């Protein structure tokens, strides 16, 4: 379907946020809404996003299970219509922590299906709308993508895949004028971090970021200058920046030692 773009001056910029009912997604939706954006708030928890939208004229909401490609198509058509999409925030995610063999197989599969395949579904379905607006994708990644974390094995694997997906699509979609970025926080004070509170790395490194910190990073990322050869990844918080630099310059044996000391 080829539809001419609507001039930007006639409408507010648009952002669609997955997992917008709670935590980081909710904080991002609130921030962009407070600054005059048209915000699509979607979550498997329909009641949460309905309450959050609260009848605000620039807030739209609905149910979205990111694992369902057909649901993605319906949501995008309903929210975007003949308009493009300025920003997609791929935030929906789940986490199961513990020793790998102690976590049941359905929980491992659920993390892969939501954290990775849900993001693949969203990127694939939203591309025509993003291309129309020369928009951006912001993928929620994690510091667990920097090196495999014992106790968070499958979760970290999904986030490492998200990191790779971000890099590939940012290069592949550049000719269409679509930027792809990732946000890489360490542990954030949300229900998800609470679920991982028994992981050794959470206990030793602590939880020093809030959902609002990540939302502010999302705002800066969306409004940052696009530099062709700059990394698409944005570390959130001082701890994460130090970890990212350390992982990039340290020999593998030293990185393994550091991870072992914090995660075991």
Where does each model-flagged region fall?
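Conserved glycine-rich Rossmann-like NAD(P)H-binding loop of the short-chain dehydrogenase/reductase
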Residues: 35-50
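Active-site helix of classical SDR
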Residues: 123, 158
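Residue(s) in the substrate-gating loop at a strand-loop-helix junction
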Residues: 142
């Amino acid at each position: 379907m080829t539809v001419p773009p609507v001039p930007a001056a006639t409408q507010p910029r648009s952002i669609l946020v997955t997992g917008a009912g709670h935590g980081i997604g909710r904080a991002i939706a609130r921030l962009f809404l407070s600054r005059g954006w048209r915000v699509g708030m979607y979550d498997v928890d329909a009641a949460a996003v309905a309450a959050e939208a609260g009848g605000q004229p620039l807030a739209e909401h609905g149910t979205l299970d990111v694992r369902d490609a057909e649901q993605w198509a319906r949501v995008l058509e309903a929210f975007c219509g003949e308009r493009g999409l300025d920003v997609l925030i791929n935030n929906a995610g789940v986490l199961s922590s513990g020793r790998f063999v102690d976590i049941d197989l359905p929980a491992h599969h659920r993390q892969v299906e939501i954290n990775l395949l849900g993001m693949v579904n969203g990127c694939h379905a939203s591309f025509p709308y993003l291309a129309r607006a020369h928009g951006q994708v912001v993928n929620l990644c994690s510091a667990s993508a920097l090196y495999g974390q014992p106790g968070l094995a499958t979760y970290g694997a999904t986030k490492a895949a998200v990191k790779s997906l971000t890099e590939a699509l940012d290069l592949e979609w550049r000719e269409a004028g679509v930027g792809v970025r990732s946000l890489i926080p360490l542990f954030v004070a949300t229900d998800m971090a609470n679920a991982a509170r028994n992981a050794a790395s959470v206990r030793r490194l602590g939880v020093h970021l809030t959902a609002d910190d990540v939302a502010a990073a999302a705002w800066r990322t969306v409004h940052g200058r696009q530099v062709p050869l700059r990394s698409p990844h944005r570390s959130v918080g001082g701890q994460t920046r130090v970890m990212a630099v350390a992982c990039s310059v340290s020999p593998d044996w030293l990185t393994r030692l550091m991870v072992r000391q914090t995660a075991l």
